[in-house]
């Protein structure tokens, strides 16, 4: 190959990577600003800000997932300030990163750069852009995706240092959210162990084993220096979330028609890929094991999606599966493979447009579908740090202007309590940072479905009850505020303290629990 040809390939690659990086970054940045679903949109906002102020998860507030996401977001806040730009920048950077990884993966499996570029553009529209802001399920899934693609690309290579990095990504996925990576660890371990033993590649097994030991020691060290007791970490991040998963599994209902309708554009090409691969590959070849791992990854994500209560976020699998199908067609002897490839790209364009309109333009992931987004207003009217966001909350029944007025009045009431420690129970998880007043949120979310905190029937009820009481005493909290219009039940607090330890008052904006018995 001539130097001129090599330079041309490098220039083409650089051009595609540059366009992909810019497109995936700015498309996420754009759609992040359209509307707000506070309970999800701001899930990591104040919790990341609290880390910068030495309020740590597990130790200072109850957490069941999102440790890694909060820590990464606090890093963005540290560099760029605590504001909306730094918040959406985090997700936009992540969308850029995973899009580039997908492009590199596709070119590594010998897909033409142009087609890899097309598949990656589709991926960038269907991945983080559907949320636009940091979200636990997405971070957990995409860390696992990168790890999975690296595993597939490095099964037969001798770049053993990458297995340390893969293990690190698995840990990041777990500390973003415990699932789906827990399922992947169980199944991947069996497949990879059998593959490495068959190929007598014991060095990779050793590297993975010692990488796991290293990261576990690192975890214990981090907990120790931050004065987080391992027992508390175990209950909040390991044992309690396991009980949530068990409950959902016991109440799981499956409807075949609904299932196929939602996932048909994943299931059909996946079955076609499996059929083509079984026809031509040896069972234990690197290529077959790589495809098996991706099929396992896809099945795990479908199962995880069925178990979670969130909107569907796994349509990003479609362009990757189409990319793998393109590889099969390219290496086949089909007479009309060129036309089949073009037809596939047209189908993918249709699917991408369909879900782009539904999830990006209509913001379905944050439940803004059929909400009049044209009535949105600038969130900087709430506070200058929210500049760049357009406010429209699907769970507020009035106009955005009315809600902003309530939030501005709420800030004044909070300021009037500057001399006292208060606790706020709210889905508006940005008030801590914009008021510079500690809201002392006892947990990251406030739902009564058992996913936020232990209910009275849960075995960890007494543990959380003591956790909440200790927090109230330690911080000398004498008032707990609830926004009237949010209608969050008082049980979030009253289920965990005695009836004679509070009185309920109200003003124009809040219901207030005035606490006694905790001095």
Predicted regions located by residue number:
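Short acidic/glycine- and proline-prone juxtamembrane loop motifs at membrane-interface regions
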Residues: 130-140
């Amino acid at each position: 190959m001539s130097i001129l040809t090599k330079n041309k390939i490098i220039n083409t690659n650089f051009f595609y990577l540059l366009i992909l990086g810019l497109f995936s970054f700015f498309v996420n940045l754009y759609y992040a600003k359209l509307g707000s679903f506070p309970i999800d949109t701001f899930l990591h906002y104040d919790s990341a800000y609290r880390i910068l102020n030495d309020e740590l998860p597990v130790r200072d507030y109850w957490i069941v997932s999102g440790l890694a996401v909060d820590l990464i977001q606090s890093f963005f806040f540290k560099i760029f300030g605590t504001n909306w730009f730094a918040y959406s920048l985090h997700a936009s950077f992540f969308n850029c990163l995973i899009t580039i990884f997908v492009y590199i993966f596709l070119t590594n499996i010998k897909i033409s750069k142009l087609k890899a570029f097309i598949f990656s553009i589709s991926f960038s529209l269907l991945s983080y852009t559907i949320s636009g802001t940091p979200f636990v399920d997405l971070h957990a899934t995409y860390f696992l995706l990168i790890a999975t693609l690296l595993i597939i690309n490095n099964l037969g290579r001798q770049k053993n240092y990458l297995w340390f990095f893969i293990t690190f990504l698995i840990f990041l996925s777990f500390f973003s959210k415990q699932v789906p990576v827990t399922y992947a660890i169980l199944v991947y371990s069996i497949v990879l162990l059998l593959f490495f033993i068959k190929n007598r590649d014991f060095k990779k097994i050793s590297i993975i084993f010692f990488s796991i030991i290293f990261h576990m020691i690192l975890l214990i060290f981090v907990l120790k220096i931050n004065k987080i007791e391992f027992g508390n970490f175990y209950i909040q991040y390991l044992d309690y979330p396991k009980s949530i998963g068990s409950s959902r599994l016991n109440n799981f209902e499956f409807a075949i028609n609904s299932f196929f309708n939602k996932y048909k554009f994943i299931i059909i090409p996946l079955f076609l890929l499996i059929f083509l691969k079984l026809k031509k590959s040896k069972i234990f070849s690197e290529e077959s094991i790589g495809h098996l791992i991706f099929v396992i990854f896809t099945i795990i994500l479908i199962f995880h999606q069925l178990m979670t209560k969130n909107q569907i976020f796994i349509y990003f699998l479609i362009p990757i599966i189409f990319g793998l199908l393109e590889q099969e067609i390219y290496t086949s002897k089909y007479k009309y493979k060129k036309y089949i490839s073009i037809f596939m790209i047209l189908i993918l364009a249709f699917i991408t447009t369909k879900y782009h309109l539904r999830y990006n333009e209509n913001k379905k992931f944050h439940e803004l579908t059929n909400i009049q987004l044209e009535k949105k207003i600038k969130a900087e009217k709430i506070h200058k740090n929210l500049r760049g966001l357009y406010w429209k909350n699907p769970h507020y029944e009035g106009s955005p202007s009315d809600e902003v007025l309530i939030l501005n009045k709420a800030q004044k009431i909070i300021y009037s309590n500057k001399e006292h420690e208060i606790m706020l129970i709210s889905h508006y998880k940005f008030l801590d940072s914009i008021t510079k007043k500690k809201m002392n949120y006892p947990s990251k979310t406030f739902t009564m479905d058992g996913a936020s905190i232990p209910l009275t029937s849960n075995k960890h009820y007494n543990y959380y009850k003591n956790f909440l009481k200790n927090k109230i005493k330690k911080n000398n909290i004498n008032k707990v505020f609830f926004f009237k219009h949010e209608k969050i039940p008082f049980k979030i607090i009253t289920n965990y303290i005695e009836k004679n330890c509070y009185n309920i008052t109200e003003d124009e904006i809040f219901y207030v629990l005035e606490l006694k018995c905790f001095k």
